[in-house]
């Protein structure tokens, strides 16, 4: 049953924790994000940021604690069920198929997002194909929003596309299901400084294009978080140690100690 609080975050975790062989990789994390918010997660290497996203997206099963999406408990759902409920994500390492075209990579995401059965594919091909290609048109329009030249290159193989455009394709593919929450794990990994600024600006514009969406960004560089997220959450040793805007975070003694005492990602 959905929770009926007077205030309901779009995504909320309560005491979320996971234990691997006696080590609490994520420990007692309370977190909230509202519609149309962008929140950054940051912390030293191994601090639990990606593990936290893996629990929220159903890849890992929490040892204790709960996660709610729009008031519905999603803690025990499998990844595809979480995806169907409205959480989509990208990964630090590319999930594109290098020997498929840009358009075909979008089609892979579309087919997954529509939850078609084998029977649908064989016995209702016209309906399935019509819906798929309608979604492809939407995907190409999203690509045009990020980079118009990508639409002209939709038949190029992914391996021949610049790295920043591969990131755009992955984000576009994640948006095709029209998620409530978008999780981005180091979307600027492998980009130079100029490309990083461009990418972060494009992420900021996502909430203008997709009304109501909430975005969670993991980044390894504190400076990258200066302009875009409204709020930053800092992890260290599996725990949330600080939360606030950029200026509050960079002056927080717990954060300073965490970065001086550990290797930054």
Predicted segment positions?
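Short, Lys/Arg-enriched N-terminal segments with co-localized hydrophobic residues
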Residues: 1-7
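Glycine-rich phosphate-binding loops of nucleotide-dependent enzymes
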Residues: 7-265
């Amino acid at each position: 049953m959905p929770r009926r609080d007077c205030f309901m975050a779009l995504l909320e975790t309560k005491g979320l924790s996971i234990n691997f062989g006696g080590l609490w990789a994520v420990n007692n994390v309370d977190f909230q994000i509202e519609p149309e918010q962008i929140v950054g997660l940051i912390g030293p290497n191994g601090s639990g940021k990606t593990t936290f996203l893996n629990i929220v997206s159903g890849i890992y099963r929490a040892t204790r604690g709960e996660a709610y999406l729009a008031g519905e408990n999603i803690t025990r759902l499998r990844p595809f069920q979480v995806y169907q409920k409205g959480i989509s994500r990208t990964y630090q390492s590319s999930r594109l198929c290098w020997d498929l075209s840009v358009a075909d990579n979008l089609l892979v995401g579309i087919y997954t997002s529509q939850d078609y059965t084998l029977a649908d594919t064989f016995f209702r091909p016209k309906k399935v194909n019509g819906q798929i290609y309608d979604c492809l048109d939407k995907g190409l329009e999203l690509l045009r929003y990020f980079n118009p030249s990508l639409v002209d290159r939709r038949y190029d193989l992914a391996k021949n596309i610049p790295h920043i455009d591969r990131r755009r394709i992955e984000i576009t593919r994640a948006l095709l299901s029209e998620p409530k929450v978008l999780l981005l794990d180091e979307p600027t990994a492998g980009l130079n400084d100029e490309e990083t600024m461009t990418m972060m600006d494009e992420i900021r514009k996502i909430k203008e294009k997709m009304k109501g969406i909430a975005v969670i960004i993991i980044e390894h560089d504190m400076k990258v978080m200066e302009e875009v997220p409204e709020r930053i959450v800092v992890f260290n040793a599996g725990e949330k140690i600080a939360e606030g805007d950029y200026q509050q975070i960079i002056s927080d003694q717990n954060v300073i100690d965490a970065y001086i005492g550990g290797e930054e990602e």
